[in-house]
Every structure is written in structure tokens, then in C-alpha cells.
Amino acid sequence: MASEITYAEVRIKNESNSSVTYSGSPAAPREKPTRHLSKPGSLLVPFTSLMVLLLLLAITFLVAFIIYFQKYSQFLEEKKAIKGITHKELNCIKNVLLMEEKSWSCCPKNWKPFGSHCYWVTKHTSTYSKASWSESEKNCFSMGAHLLVIHSKEEQDFITGILNRDAAYFIGLWDSGHRQWQWVSQTPYNASATFWHKGEPSSDDEKCVIINHLNSGWGWNDIPCSGKQQSVCQMKKIQL
């Protein structure tokens, strides 16, 4: 009897070989991140602004320091001037010049103001009545002044307007030798701005100068320094 052979078809499903279906386009390759580098010009703008700001601050500080220094220096000058004042009373005039830093110009009481100076004339009844030229200069110096110095006709006319015609007054002009005239203030002697009487100066032995009135009017005359005369003192106005 012939044996029967049964054949069976066996299919083994290999999942590893199973097909995979993708939908859509293939995935694009991943891009590398890019670094955003700042341009040099973008950094220059804030740096320049910072430098300008620092410069403005420096200038402001410098200006403030200069103003403070000027004010402080002015304060020290005023303090020194007030400390050096030997006069108890002052007559002051308010300055009207807009550019004038100090607002008051002062002269001691009983002194006459003219221009930028104050003038004091000795009287017969005053403490400093009549004295030699050197004594007169010392008297003026003790009051913070010196003997009169004249550099213009306007000043000469002002002085003669407050003097007594019957008196003579020493001024701060003297002969240092060989007709070398000098002012006590050390300002230059200008021969073209002098007011000598006619024929004066007349003697090498007369080395000091007075201002007096003759028939021809007011003028200068040289006399011996030891003679006793009245005098005129002069000082700069006190600025407050």
C-alpha cells in the first residue's frame, strides 16, 4: 500500500523583512546653528556716546572747580583787605559796572574819592599838621597810603580844587640824585605830564616837591626835604 505523503506549504513571516511605508517627502538634513556676530560699527556708537558723556562731565567739573577757586580767591582777598583796614569807618559807593565783580568802592571817612583813589589832606588842627617830607610819607604809610602821586591834568585839577591856596603840600615826588625824579609809588615819572611852576625845578639841593598856589596858579615847586609842610595822602579805593 502506497503511503500517502501530504505536502503542506508553510510561509514564515519575517518581521524583520517587513516593508515599511513612509508618507511625505524625505526629512531634510538638520542645519547647523549659525552664530550672529556683531558688526564693529554697532559697538562703536555706544562707546562714542560714553566717551562724549565722560568728556562733558569732565568739562562741567573743571568749570565748576574754576568758578569755586575764583570765588574762594576773591573771598581771601576781601578777608585780607578787611583785615588790613586801619580805618574804623568807610564811605562806600555802589559800582554800576556790570562786569565789576566787587560791588562796593570805599574810602575812609573824611577822605575824598576820585577815580580809583582816595585822598586825604592834612589840616592845621589835625594830628598830622606839618612835617618834613619823610615824616609826611611815614604818616601816610601808617594809614595804608602814600604821598600824593599825580599822572594827569584831571587829577591835578581835582586835587587843587580841595586844597587851601594859602598853604603848601608835600607830594610823593622826590629827586634821587642828578635830577632823577621818582614817585613814591614806583610808577614812571612822565616829564610831559608835570605841572611845575615856571622856572622850576630850580636847585639841585632841593630834592622834594610841594604843590602850592602862586599868582600864576597852582603848580609844583622843589624845596628842601627838611622843611615842614602840610601834605596830601593817597590810597587805592577799598573794594568790597
Swiss-Prot record:
Expressed by myeloid cells (dendritic cells, macrophages, and neutrophils) and B-cells. SUPFAM superfamilies: C-type lectin-like. Ca(2+) 1 binds at V149, E155. GO terms for cellular component: external side of plasma membrane. Glycans are attached at N190. N-acetyl-D-glucosamine binds at I211, N212, H213. InterPro entries: C-type_lectin-like, C-type_lectin-like/link_sf, C-type_lectin/snaclec_domain, C-type_lectin_CS, CD209-like_CTLD, CTDL_fold. Ca(2+) 2 binds at E200, S202, E206, N221, D222. Residues 1-48 are cytoplasmic. Its main location: membrane. Keywords: Adaptive immunity, Calcium, Cell membrane, Disulfide bond, Glycoprotein, Immunity, Innate immunity, Lectin, Membrane, Metal-binding, Signal-anchor, Transmembrane, Transmembrane helix. The keyword Metal-binding applies. C-type lectin receptor that binds carbohydrates mannose and fucose but also weakly interacts with N-acetylglucosamine (GlcNAc) in a Ca(2+)-dependent manner. Involved in regulating immune reactivity. Once triggered by antigen, it is internalized by clathrin-dependent endocytosis and delivers its antigenic cargo into the antigen presentation pathway resulting in cross-priming of CD8(+) T cells. This cross-presentation and cross-priming are enhanced by TLR7 and TLR8 agonists with increased expansion of the CD8(+) T cells, high production of IFNG and TNF with reduced levels of IL4, IL5 and IL13. This is C-type lectin domain family 4 member A. The gene is Clec4a.
